[in-house]
């Protein structure tokens, strides 16, 4: 059965071209969502892949960091991919991700672990506080949190903080255990169908929260006994989703050629993030793990 790769892109077209070329395999269908604010579409539309089918989504969400719009963009991808399925796995990637294993390796890995859900769960010490702060309080102006105007960012942060404290008596009411983790996942057909079926609940409950994309899918999986039992790993958030992401050296760290050995020795399947400013590591990854390697 084929795999579906769901890509959320907004920035570098050259890097996106590398990612698409590395996923260009007859066993893959690729679904591409380009942020409505981005001007990348003109550069993407002429692209024709030789083996994989590429679907460039017409419905484009204006994605804002920390805002419900990120969840809406994910739902656009999940819903479009379901129309063309079923698929063995649905892989959610950003436009700044790259595979760090060959397509043969990736497909073999998921065949050996068929039925597992690759969803990272964060059990860190700050989870409870983060959950109360982001999920229980009301956040009213998250669409302006990262405006291109620096002064507006500062004003919005202060206003959000003030209003969230003012509205403390009117906290969101939770009737489930929240879970948190990276929004980059690889999940089964059954899991995607379930996530899509819960869309009305998700859009209502996670509205006026902060960074809900870190919580919604993990919460759905965590509260479903079958999907929770199928989690690949609960011990490590990024082992759980098989992504190599370094938050200790950056937000997240941008991989360079100096990290070649770490990338080469990692057991993870995908890594982020990359930047064309460090083109040498990107060229090395493409040569090592590209579709023709």
Description of each model-found segment:
Residues 1-293:
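ER/Golgi luminal nucleotide-sugar-dependent glycosyltransferases, focusing on the catalytic module
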